Amino acid sequence: VSNEPLIPELPAPGKIREMKTDPLFGATVLTLDNGIKVVLKHTDFKKDEILMTATSPGGSTLFGAKDIDNLKVFNDVITLGGAGNFSATDLNKVLAGKKVSCSPSIGLNTENVNGYAAPADLKTLFELVYLYFTAPRMDEEAYTSFENRMIAQLKNLELNPMVAFSDTLTKAIYDNNPRAARITAGDFKQISYPRIMEMYKERFADASDFVFTFVGNIDTDSIRPFVEQYLATLPVKGRAEKANPAEVPAICKGEYTNIFKRALETPKASVVNFWSGKMEYNLENILTATMLKQILDLVYMEKVREDEGGTYGVQTSAQISSFPEGQTFLQAY
């Protein structure tokens, strides 16, 4: 298996339609003849590493209610079968000794491919990208093994009373929206492996609106042949897509309090306070939220743990989301 090439046959290379320099970051921006954009930024932080990220608008919000359970395991399942002519096990054998990784995934409002490689293994990274777009592979045996492991883990997890606490919190915050709920053992009755792979092919059937970004020890002249061979030949349909904001779980408005009791081996009380509001998504607000979290951590550590001795600690989080609109979240636990 290890002697077989990852890609037995390749189409004729595509072409770079346009090349320009980004004035802000000094990156090289390529537009390929199939519509894909490629951003190349040379850095000297690590000589043995090139990072890659690729994104396209769309994401899980483009699927309806019937696929909610499938989406819960989507990212865990899509590479179980490997790619091309290689099972996941055989693919790992082929990649043994190489510094390379490539992972497709779907987010709330994007499709993504993330990866990295040492400069010497950069061609392999491009080959993996090409395979995950053009030749995803199913493996029913691998999926059955995954399903059995997950069901056993989830049944064991659901014995933990704190899971009930977390589930209740999620239901309260998102007004019992099924898209926000975690996966349960019972969900596997509705999950379909063939449907997930069908969804995957649908989302990655059109590469024309993807932007690939490579950062690291890049030589532009050396990487261009890989771009032309493996990215400029990806399938395209010219779809103009954007995520569907109507399918994003909305945070419940107004004040809500939920107090419930559950038997524990070691009695304790857990309290979560959650606040949300509208806020513009920009760098200033992101930094402000980060500093707020750090300040609250210091204050709670001093007042609640050290002065009052009332708890082992308080955890906080503060963040801002940009989709479907600017929104801030603050949590103290």
Language model regions located:
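Short Ser/Thr-interspersed hydrophobic loop/turn segments at strand-loop and sheet-helix junctions
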Residues: 296-297
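Proteolytic maturation boundary segments
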Residues: 1-65, 211-213, 218-263, 269-271, ...
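M16 family metallopeptidases and their MPP-like homologs
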Residues: 1, 46-79, 83-135, 147-155, ...
